[in-house]
UniProtKB/Swiss-Prot annotation:
Protein known as: N-acetyltransferase 9-like protein
Cited Pfam families: Acetyltransf_3
Keyword Protein transport set for record: no
Family: Belongs to the acetyltransferase family. GNAT subfamily.
Keyword Transferase: yes
Domain N-acetyltransferase residue range list: 34-201
Species, as recorded: Dictyostelium discoideum
Superkingdom to which the source organism belongs: Eukaryota
EC number: 2.3.1.-
GO molecular function, one term: N-acetyltransferase activity
UniProt keyword list: Acyltransferase, Transferase
Cross-referenced InterPro entries: Acyl_CoA_acyltransferase, GNAT_dom, NAT9-like
Length: 212
């Protein structure tokens, strides 16, 4: 979605940046993993198809995609190379986080997805922070079109299910035919306060008009 095409969101542990062409090669390499494709319900693509995906997502008015950077790793790489570079950006990539708007009859429903592709970056709270930040972004900047969030998680992925439940997502119904559990978060004042998004000093949005 073009609305986030020049937006960088900085948190305590992660930095969210728009999915650009420079990120495609590493993203494509992640998706060569059968495990990751299974977890994300993704098809195996050629690198040319992945470039087409990136361009399509950029133009899609119903999808917001951010690449997740490990903030400490980025700062470490910048220190080693005496400043910021595209190479440091790529080295610090650990996954992605998305909001989808186009799949539901219920207007205002947005589906969240998060992937931590780098095994060494898992179980460190990075996915949780990325989800909190993108939800805060949605509540702050997309409040007119985002009334509630949902996630679909494989029933065997208990760590992810428990993470979302701890963020005040509630299970809706039982396991579906795809062996997925549906969880929902209503954008009410109490829920937003529980996430502590409004008063989070580690959350800020920066706009870079010509960021590449």
């Amino acid at each position: 979605m073009k609305i986030n095409s020049n937006t960088i969101i900085i948190g305590k542990k992660v930095i969210l940046v728009p999915y650009k062409k420079k990120h495609v090669e590493k993203y494509w390499k992640w998706m060569q993993s059968e495990e990751i494709r299974e977890q994300t319900a993704s098809e195996e693509l050629t690198i040319e198809e992945e470039f087409e995906n990136q361009e399509s997502w950029f133009k899609d008015d119903h999808k917001i995609t951010f690449i997740i950077l490990d903030k400490d790793l980025l700062l470490e790489n910048e220190k080693d190379s005496n400043g910021y570079s595209n190479e440091n950006d790529i080295k610090s990539m650990i996954g992605d986080v998305n909001i989808f708007f186009n799949q539901y009859e219920d207007e205002g429903t947005a589906e969240l997805e998060v992937m931590i592709a780098e095994p060494t970056s898992r179980r460190k709270g990075l996915a949780r922070e990325a989800i909190s930040i993108i939800m805060g972004y949605g509540i702050e900047h997309l409040s007119t079109i985002t009334k509630k969030y949902i996630v679909k998680i494989g029933e065997s992925n208990q760590p992810s299910i428990q993470m979302f439940k701890s963020m005040n997502f509630k299970q809706i119904g039982s396991v579906n035919v795809f062996k997925e559990i549906l969880l929902e978060f209503e954008n009410g004042e109490n829920n937003i306060n529980l996430l502590n998004l409004k008063n989070n000093d580690n959350y800020k949005s920066l706009i870079f008009k010509n960021w590449e």
